[in-house]
Curated annotation (Swiss-Prot):
Organism: Bos taurus
The protein's role, per its UniProt record: Plays a role in pre-mRNA splicing and in the regulation of alternative splicing events. Activates exon skipping of its own pre-mRNA during muscle cell differentiation. Binds to the polypyrimidine tract of introns. May promote RNA looping when bound to two separate polypyrimidine tracts in the same pre-mRNA. May promote the binding of U2 snRNP to pre-mRNA. Cooperates with RAVER1 to modulate switching between mutually exclusive exons during maturation of the TPM1 pre-mRNA. Represses the splicing of MAPT/Tau exon 10.
Presence of keyword tRNA-binding: no
Broad class of the protein's primary localization: nucleus
Assembly behavior: Monomer. Part of a ternary complex containing KHSRP, PTBP1, PTBP2 and HNRPH1. Interacts with RAVER1 and SFPQ.
Residues bearing PTM Phosphothreonine: 138
Protein name: Polypyrimidine tract-binding protein 1
N-acetylmethionine modifications at: 1
GO MF annotation, one: pre-mRNA binding
Length: 557
């Protein structure tokens, strides 16, 4: 059966498809004015259901436990990622609906997906299964006008006819998006890795035409306002993406409709973009993040010219593919997502395989422009260890201004490169690129090395050896403010200030955490001083079996 629903007048329970006419047996259901009344819970007639098993695939899908105020558009949007929705029947009195997909394959994919991921509408979990009926046929009764208008509006958008979708006639006829904004407010929670404007554009443009994006930080949260060409696309994106992670276990999307109906973008840069106005100025003389990152990665530009192919969302976001299902013409979150190469560093936490970056050879970094008088394998191990588990370090014997650093994998290498490239170490800005080497070779026995090659494969100082470690949540770019932890009770503020100024650095500020005195923030005179202090003092023995832990902080004092 499609599920159990109470019969309002009689008080018995029966399969919901019994709402349909007794004359229907595995055939189309023709919606008449009388049965429309029944479908809305206003008639107590009993109908005999057919004998088909609800587990048998059908183009018609039965949806239960809908919120009382659900709109036609919200119901339609459940099916949109899987293909064209060809018909809709709303049973509002029963908090149920039936939708008909264009193909049985699309319906099968949809049911399989929602079996694994429970859909939520307006905060309420809903239930989806195959209907006993192979086809829905509806008449022109007034009760169906809203559903048909919403279907017409959505399908016109899918076919590119935005004029019809935007027409007042479609809205007035009951388009579910009436009065709804095409602007979404997006909050990215657990932002352990950078999420750029272009990453957002690639993700959200899979649901419709993105016109404008503005990104900003509010209440210490990365947020964005994103405007679609139409509210149907906004609804589709919200239903498909809200609560999903961009990368594994982090960067969670929280999406609501904005009160704004349009965005006013003045500048095209890494913070805001109007895709309808490529002529807008950048607003400052600094190169945009796009250009900087593209240069760092040796790429001509951030955006991939190819369509969505290559890297995918994490397995939780790619259930149809993981299950071996075919998803034809998927316009939603289930289609493969190509992450721009310059955003590769952001994918480190998710271990997403990015074409051209995920090979074993790409876990080795070439670090150049080092200070040959001061560089040591240990200093590079500590610094690069902020962004991953360093396996080996080799300072080149005949060219000590160059070194090779081997990370645990390619994604950690990308993360370290994106955060450290260009920062000053021992007075010189370091340059970091991917090495052509697949691994760092240890010196042969008897080979002169002067201790310039070190193997750290089993180091106890690895920050990320435990899966799901909280250290993944505390990876930030180098900054003048350092986060200190594992401080014993006997150590005072003055003790730490003296310690951090002992190597010539200037301590500009200090603050213990109010709720946990084992942690503190300390602000150095510059980012370069903070980098040096981290190298010198991470794992410093403070006594009482406490070794100081030092990392870069996102906060300031």
């Amino acid at each position: 059966m499609d599920g159990i629903v109470p019969d309002i007048a009689v008080g018995t329970k029966r399969g919901s498809d019994e709402l349909f006419s007794a004359c229907v047996t595995n055939g189309p259901f023709i919606m008449s004015g009388t049965s429309a009344s029944t479908a809305n819970g206003n008639d107590s007639k009993k109908f005999k259901g057919d004998s088909r098993s609800a587990g048998v695939p059908s183009r018609v899908i039965h949806i239960r436990k809908l919120p009382g105020d659900v709109t036609e558009g919200e119901v339609i949007s459940l099916g949109l990622p899987f293909g064209k929705v060809t018909n809709l029947l709303m049973l509002k009195g029963k908090n149920q609906a039936f939708i008909e997909m264009h193909t049985e394959e699309a319906a099968n994919t949809m049911v399989n997906y929602y079996t694994s991921v429970t859909p939520v509408l307006r905060g309420q979990p809903i239930y989806i299964q195959f209907s006993n009926h192979k086809e829905l046929k509806t008449d022109s009764s007034p009760n169906q006008a809203r559903a048909q208008a919403a279907l017409q509006a959505v399908n016109s958008v899918q076919s590119g006819n935005l004029a019809l979708a935007a027409s007042a006639a479609a809205v007035d006829a009951g388009m579910a998006m009436a009065g709804q904004s095409p602007v979404l407010r997006i909050i990215v929670e657990n932002l352990f890795y950078p999420v750029t404007l272009d990453v957002l554009h690639q993700i959200f443009s899979k649901f419709g035409t993105v016109l404008k994006i503005i990104t900003f930080t509010k209440n210490n949260q990365f947020q964005a306002l994103l405007q679609y060409a139409d509210p149907v696309s906004a609804q589709h994106a919200k239903l498909s993406l809200d609560g999903q992670n961009i990368y594994n276990a982090c960067c969670t999307l929280r999406i609501d409709f904005s009160k704004l109906t349009s965005l006013n973008v003045k500048y095209n840069n890494d913070k805001s973009r109007d895709y309808t106005r490529p002529d807008l100025p950048s607003g400052d003389s600094q190169p945009s993040l796009d250009q900087t990152m593209a240069a760092a990665f040796g790429a001509p530009g951030i955006m991939s010219a190819s369509p969505y192919a290559g890297a995918g969302f994490p397995p939780t976001f790619a259930i149809p593919q993981a299950a071996g299902l075919s998803v034809p013409n998927v316009h939603g979150a289930l289609a493969p997502l190509a992450i721009p190469s310059a955003a590769a560093a952001a994918a480190a936490a998710g271990r997403i395989a990015i074409p051209g970056l995920a090979g074993a050879g790409n876990s080795v970094l070439l670090v150049s422009n080092l200070n040959p008088e001061r560089v040591t394998p240990q200093s590079l191990f500590i610094l690069f260890g902020v962004y991953g588990d360093v396996q080996r370090v080799k300072v080149l014997f005949n060219k000590k201004e160059n070194a090779l650093v081997q990370m645990a994998d390619g994604s950690q290498a990308q993360l370290a490169m994106s955060h450290l490239n260009g920062h000053k170490l021992h007075g010189k800005p370091v340059r970091i690129t991917l090495s052509k080497h697949q691994s760092v070779q240890l010196p042969r026995e008897g080979q002169e090395d002067q201790g310039l090659t070190k193997d750290y494969g089993n180091s106890p100082l690895h920050r990320f050896k435990k899966p799901g470690s909280k250290n993944f949540q505390n990876i930030f770019p180098p900054s003048a403010t350092l986060h200190l932890s594992n401080i014993p009770p006997s150590i005072s503020e003055d003790d730490l200030k003296i310690l951090f100024s002992s190597n010539g650095g200037i301590v500009k500020g200090f603050k213990f955490f109010q709720k946990d005195r084992k942690m503190a923030l300390i602000q150095m005179g510059s980012v370069e001083e903070a980098i040096q202090a981290l190298i010198d003092l991470h794992n410093h023995d403070l006594g009482e079996n406490h070794h100081l832990r030092v990392s870069f902080s996102k906060s300031t004092i």
